[in-house]
Design a protein with these regions (language model features):
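Amphipathic HAMP/coiled-coil signal-transducing linker helices
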Residues: 1-12, 25, 32
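Heptad-repeat coiled-coil signal-transmission/dimerization helices
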Residues: 16, 20, 37, 48, ...
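Catalytic strand-loop-helix junctions within cyclic-nucleotide turnover domains
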Residues: 42-44, 76-85, 100-125
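PAS-family sensory domain
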Residues: 32-34, 63, 101, 135
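Active-site-proximal structural segments of metal-dependent nucleotidyl cyclase/transferase enzymes
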Residues: 16-43
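Catalytic core of bacterial cyclic-dinucleotide metallophosphodiesterases
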Residues: 1-5, 70-71, 139-140
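Conserved helix-loop-beta segment at the catalytic/binding core of cyclic-nucleotide signaling proteins
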Residues: 22-29, 48-82, 94-99
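Catalytic/regulatory signature loops of cyclic-dinucleotide turnover enzymes
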Residues: 97-102, 121-141
Length: 141
């Protein structure tokens, strides 16, 4: 009997991009939402691989995490409203206490109309959180 995997699957960036595109198409057809959170380390201290290992167990097995260039990861959160993102980040924060981080979120179709917009918006929001001092989640208004 295979043990049940706990937490999100960590995938390569190219696979992640395909997953985001597929989920936004499914979300449009099935009328649900898809959110992304871009989480970055502001002052070194951990690699994207280590960051992915920290966050993956704290999110659902139906979600995905990808290491990005630089010191960041992006989380695909299926059927998670943008209003749920602060609660999700609260769940992740205990595993991030020893590093300086910034996060940005976006939600399809609420704040972004395409997969590209979703990815870009999450990145922009992360940069905004970093400019505001870090250790926070920034969301579009």
């Amino acid at each position: 009997m295979t043990p049940t995997r706990v937490g999100a699957q960590i995938v390569e960036p190219a696979v992640f991009r395909v997953l985001v595109e597929m989920e936004t198409r499914k979300a449009q057809r099935m009328r649900y939402v898809v959110s992304l959170v871009s989480l970055g380390v502001d002052e070194g201290g951990t690699s994207p691989a280590a960051l992915a290992q920290r966050v993956a167990p704290a999110i659902r097995a139906t979600d995905a995490v990808a290491m990005q260039t630089g010191d960041s990861v992006t989380m695909l959160l299926v059927d998670a409203e943008d209003t749920n993102l602060p609660t999700i980040m609260e769940r992740l924060t205990p595993g991030l206490e020893d590093i300086s981080w910034s996060a940005g979120g976006a939600c399809y179709p609420k704040t972004a109309a395409t997969a590209d917009e979703l990815l870009n918006q999450a990145e922009r929001m992360r940069e905004q959180a970093k400019r505001q001092g870090g250790r926070r989640l920034s969301l579009p208004h």
